[in-house]
């Protein structure tokens, strides 16, 4: 069931499943995607007794900015603060967080900056806090090639391309990043409808430019960005899941940052899974949440 809640910045649309008095689990989607990432995860968790919340991030679907003057920023501090504010608005003191890509970044930011709010973390692809100061250093030629869309978004041609071709770009990236996932047009269209949000393009472009220091952030988050620049550790009990065939973020590349997950309990490489692991292997995500919840009981 779709609900909405207001924070100081946003009206956030979200799905809620399971008993209202169950242990809260917040599932956070990635880009280019939306809450449908967790269609195979949320119902089993709800049936297992968890209170499951699946919000649309800023710039997606029914999540709206309250003030036209608020900068349409997709920077990491904003995503993390939105998550904290979402929990505050619903009077949730602590939750298990699950996320990947943009949603994984929001979860990691919240876990690092407000550890008292996070009882456990399932981080799909690992430590997700950006090291913006180091972003000027180039990666391997292969990795630079994987990030072609990010360089594209640094141009006004890229902004125009995302505006005009967001459905076909999503189809292409899904195929490149999860090469073994077979999806149909109805699945694609169900998600890309969320990109009709009038702020989707602006939030996306700002996010990809800001992470390389090529766009200013919202000054409201300057203090948080300073804290994130220190690459703070995440102490919450954590399970990392990584798709063996992730076409944008290879598993080997994330392992060195495991040292920042000081509560790491387990890292699992999922055979044949790609970037959209929660869609491809939802049972693995459900199992990770259940294991962490059991260990915390």
Show which residues each predicted segment covers.
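Alpha/beta-hydrolase fold catalytic core
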Residues: 1-25, 47-50, 92, 226, ...
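Flexible "cap/lid" subdomain of the alpha/beta-hydrolase fold that forms the substrate-access gate
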Residues: 11-12, 24, 60-94, 98, ...
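Conserved HGGG/HGGXW glycine-rich cap/lid loop of the alpha/beta-hydrolase fold
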Residues: 15-65
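Conserved acidic functional residues
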Residues: 30, 101, 279-280
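Charged catalytic carboxylate motif
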Residues: 37, 82, 203, 284, ...
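Hydrophobic residues on the short alpha-helix immediately C-terminal to a glycine-rich phosphate/catalytic loop
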Residues: 41, 110, 288-292
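Short glycine-rich catalytic loops that host catalytic nucleophiles or stabilize transition states
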Residues: 267-273
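Catalytic histidine-centered segment of alpha/beta-hydrolase-like enzymes
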Residues: 273-281
């Amino acid at each position: 069931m779709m609900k909405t809640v207001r924070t100081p910045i946003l009206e956030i649309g979200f799905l809620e499943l399971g008993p209202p008095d169950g242990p809260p689990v917040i599932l956070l989607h990635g880009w280019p995607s939306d809450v449908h990432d967790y269609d195979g995860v949320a119902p089993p968790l709800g049936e297992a007794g968890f209170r499951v919340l699946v919000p649309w991030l800023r710039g997606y679907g029914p999540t709206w900015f309250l003030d036209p003057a608020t900068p349409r920023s997709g920077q990491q501090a904003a995503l993390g603060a939105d998550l904290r504010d979402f929990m505050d608005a619903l009077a949730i003191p602590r939750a298990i967080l699950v996320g990947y890509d943009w949603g994984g970044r929001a979860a990691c930011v919240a876990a690092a900056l407000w550890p008292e709010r996070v009882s456990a973390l399932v981080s799909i692809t690992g430590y997700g806090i950006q090291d913006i100061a180091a972003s000027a250093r180039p990666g391997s030629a292969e990795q630079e090639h994987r990030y072609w869309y990010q360089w594209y978004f640094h141009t006004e041609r890229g902004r125009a391309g995302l505006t005009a071709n967001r459905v076909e770009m999503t189809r292409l990236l899904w195929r490149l990043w999860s090469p073994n996932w077979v999806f149909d047009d109805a699945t694609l269209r169900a998600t890309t409808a969320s990109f009709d949000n009038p702020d989707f393009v602006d939030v996306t472009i700002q996010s990809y430019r800001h992470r390389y220091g090529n766009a200013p952030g919202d000054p409201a988050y300057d203090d948080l960005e300073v804290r994130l620049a220190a690459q703070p550790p995440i102490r919450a009990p954590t399970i990392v899941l990584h798709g063996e065939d992730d076409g944008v973020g290879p598993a080997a590349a994330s392992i060195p940052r495991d040292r920042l997950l000081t509560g790491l309990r387990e890292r699992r490489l999922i055979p044949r899974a790609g970037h959209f692991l929660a869609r491809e292997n939802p049972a693995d995500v459900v199992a990770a949440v259940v294991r962490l919840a059991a260990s915390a009981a």
